[in-house]
């Protein structure tokens, strides 16, 4: 049996202090601090990691960043490079582990910085991880609201014995919040970082959760090409695999950023399909995140209303022209 550790990671990064510097560099955010807590499979802390990093891209601290994290450039001048620190950090993580972060930005920026310095990729496709911010919402709120780490710490009445907004302290508090997740089923709600996209159709993600399915596509050159792909617009029932009958055809909202449909499975009833068009963070390609979710009659009515509202908005725009 594989024993997997949890790596509760937090990063702090600097950015350009002016527009000229920003335009002159392809790296938007330069990581200057890595903090992490390692938990075993029983969620007990077994180790920690913390190190500051010497900047190689931005040599002035962005004013807002400096005021938030209270790090001066002088503190970083004798530190090791990103390649050295990140390399040691990944060795420290070990072989069998899963990243846990507050929100999804840290994993994206870690991989962006690694690619900038020509380090090996963390994965060859979407990377499974736990978004503790999302899990907090599922455990204690409405699944949709996203709170700050400070809010969660206050809500759970966790002792605040160190300051926030440093990589080591925020990783520590994230681990403390995670220790208040008592239902094992909560950890069925994993997330995917999409810095690395599926390379081919065979690599695409099909993940089934309690009451919905998530699909992450390979890259496409544009939205039209994506919507012509059979797998993108497929609506097989995720519970039994049966073909479904279309009730509301795919229609777009938000200038083609989102698409909706309603289908019906003979066995499991109505399903709502939603397509989100996402732009790759690495190039100009787009990819699709599609969800299929069980709904009732009220859910069908909501989609019909949305479709009608979209028609009315488009009609009004045409009338203005």
Per-segment meaning from a language model:
Residues 2-108, 270-315:
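Conserved non-catalytic scaffold segment of RNase H-like nuclease domains
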Residues 19-23, 149-150, 219-221:
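Short secondary-structure boundary micro-motifs
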Residues 26, 41, 143, 227-230, ...:
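Generic marker of residues within folded, mature protein domains
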Residues 27-34, 38-69, 93-217, 282-288:
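Metal-dependent phosphoesterase core characteristic of DEDDh/y 3'-5' exonuclease domains
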Residues 85, 172, 256:
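Short Asp/Glu-rich motifs
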Residues 180-321:
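Acidic two-metal-ion nuclease catalytic site recognized across multiple nuclease folds
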């Amino acid at each position: 049996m594989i024993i997997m550790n949890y790596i509760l990671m937090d990063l702090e990064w600097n950015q350009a202090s002016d527009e000229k510097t920003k335009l002159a560099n392809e790296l938007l955010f330069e990581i200057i601090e890595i903090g992490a807590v390692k938990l075993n499979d029983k969620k007990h802390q077994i180790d920690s990691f913390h190190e500051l990093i010497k900047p190689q891209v931005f040599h002035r601290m962005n004013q807002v960043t400096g005021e938030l994290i209270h790090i001066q450039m002088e503190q970083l001048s004798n530190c090791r490079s990103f390649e050295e620190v990140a390399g040691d950090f990944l060795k420290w993580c070990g072989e069998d582990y899963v990243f846990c972060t507050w929100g999804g930005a840290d994993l994206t920026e870690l991989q962006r910085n690694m690619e900038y310095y020509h380090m090996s990729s963390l994965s060859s496709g979407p990377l499974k991880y736990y978004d503790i911010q999302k899990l907090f919402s599922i455990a204690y709120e409405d699944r949709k609201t996203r709170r700050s780490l400070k809010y969660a710490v206050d809500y759970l009445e966790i002792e605040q014995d160190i300051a926030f907004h440093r990589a080591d302290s925020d990783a520590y508090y994230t681990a403390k919040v995670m220790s208040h997740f008592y239902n094992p089923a909560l950890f069925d709600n994993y997330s995917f970082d999409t810095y690395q996209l599926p390379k081919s159709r065979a690599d695409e993600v099909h993940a089934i959760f309690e009451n919905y399915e998530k699909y992450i596509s390979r890259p496409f050159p544009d939205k039209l090409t994506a919507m012509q792909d059979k797998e993108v617009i497929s609506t097989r029932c995720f519970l039994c695999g049966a073909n479904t009958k279309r009730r509301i055809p795919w229609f777009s909202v938000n200038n083609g950023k989102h698409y909706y449909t309603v289908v019906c499975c003979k066995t499991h009833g109505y399903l709502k399909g939603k397509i989100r068009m996402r732009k790759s963070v690495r190039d100009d390609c787009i990819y699709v995140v599609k969800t299929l979710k069980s709904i009732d009659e009220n859910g069908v009515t909501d989609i019909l209303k949305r479709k009608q509202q979209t028609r009315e908005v488009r009609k009004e725009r045409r009338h203005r022209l």
